[in-house]
């Protein structure tokens, strides 16, 4: 869905995107359902896990994205060390002819939480190598600042652990990250339903990245459309400016 004409597009590094909903491809039942969901979402940028994709294969995810004119964003999902992540990013650059990468370095398979030490190391190496790095990080304002200082083009704090659907567990930290950031803040992971996506935008995020909330919904295309509307609604509400919260009631019409 196109953004409101009065609102600017999402800008990351030297590129602009009309949609502020970034989709993932993991967990889809099949390519047909994934295609319906991607179209319904209006996304222009979609992540692809390089460890699960054969770039030279036949009609797969990459072919689908090309046909839909959606920019693929390779990610380093499954990597546990900086060395693994850097190698995966380099292979993705060769396979997809892009220096953009969603950087993931997780500490373990149980929590899938980012390993801050390995993540920062990988980010520094990839930025030095000329990559446009979008790191999946903890909801830690200090780490987010370190990643920005390292040269990352955006920071992508989690709302909750990947695939949990728990929503935004620490909204205050997300607000602190946004307040201090000089690059786009993209809420990544933990989204469960449309209200979570709207809240992310109301908190100040520039965009939302999600996969499981759509691909494992009962009706993925319908949920994708809901997420697109929610992201747009949250952004519009933020730009409009909410009323201040009050302890006592205040009539909207004269009482006498």
UniProtKB/Swiss-Prot annotation:
1-deoxy-D-xylulose 5-phosphate binds at residues 163, 189-190, 211-212. GO terms for biological process: thiamine diphosphate biosynthetic process. Its EC number is 2.8.1.10. Gene3D superfamilies: Aldolase class I. InterPro entries: Aldolase_TIM (IPR013785), Thiazole_synthase_ThiG (IPR033983), ThiG (IPR008867). It holds the Pfam family ThiG. It is found in: Cytoplasm. It catalyses: [ThiS sulfur-carrier protein]-C-terminal-Gly-aminoethanethioate + 2-iminoacetate + 1-deoxy-D-xylulose 5-phosphate = [ThiS sulfur-carrier protein]-C-terminal Gly-Gly + 2-[(2R,5Z)-2-carboxy-4-methylthiazol-5(2H)-ylidene]ethyl phosphate + 2 H2O + H(+). It comes from Nocardia farcinica (strain IFM 10152). This is Thiazole synthase. Belongs to the ThiG family. GO terms for cellular component: cytoplasm. Keywords: Cytoplasm, Schiff base, Thiamine biosynthesis, Transferase. Pathway: Cofactor biosynthesis; thiamine diphosphate biosynthesis. It comes from the Bacteria. The active site is at 102 (schiff-base intermediate with dxp). PANTHER family: THIAZOLE SYNTHASE (PTHR34266:SF2). Catalyzes the rearrangement of 1-deoxy-D-xylulose 5-phosphate (DXP) to produce the thiazole phosphate moiety of thiamine. Sulfur is provided by the thiocarboxylate moiety of the carrier protein ThiS. In vitro, sulfur can be provided by H(2)S. CDD domains: ThiG (cd04728). Homotetramer. Forms heterodimers with either ThiH or ThiS.
């Amino acid at each position: 869905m196109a953004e409101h004409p009065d609102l600017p597009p999402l800008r990351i590094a030297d590129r602009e995107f009309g949609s502020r909903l970034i989709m993932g491809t993991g967990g889809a039942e099949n390519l047909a359902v994934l295609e319906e969901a991607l179209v319904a979402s209006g996304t222009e940028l979609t992540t692809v896990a390089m460890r699960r994709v054969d770039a030279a294969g036949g009609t797969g995810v990459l072919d689908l994205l090309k046909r839909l004119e959606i920019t693929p964003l390779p990610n380093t999902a499954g990597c546990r060390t900086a060395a693994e992540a850097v190698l995966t990013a380099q292979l993705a650059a060769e396979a997809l002819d892009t220096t953009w990468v969603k950087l993931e370095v997780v500490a373990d398979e149980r929590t899938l939480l980012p390993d801050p030490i390995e993540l920062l190391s990988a980010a520094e190496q990839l930025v030095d190598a000329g990559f446009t790095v979008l790191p999946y990080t903890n909801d830690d304002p200090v780490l987010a600042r370190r990643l920005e200082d390292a040269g990352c083009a955006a920071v992508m704090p989690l709302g909750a652990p990947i695939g949990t659907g728990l929503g935004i567990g620490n909204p205050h930290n997300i607000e602190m990250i946004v307040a201090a950031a000089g690059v786009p803040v993209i809420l990544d992971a933990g989204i469960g339903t449309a209200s979570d996506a709207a809240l992310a935008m109301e908190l100040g995020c520039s965009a939302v990245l999600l996969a499981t909330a759509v691909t494992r919904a009962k009706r993925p295309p319908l949920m994708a459309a809901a997420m697109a509307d929610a992201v747009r609604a949250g952004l519009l509400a933020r730009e409009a400016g909410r009323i201040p919260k009050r302890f006592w009631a205040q009539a909207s019409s004269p009482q006498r």
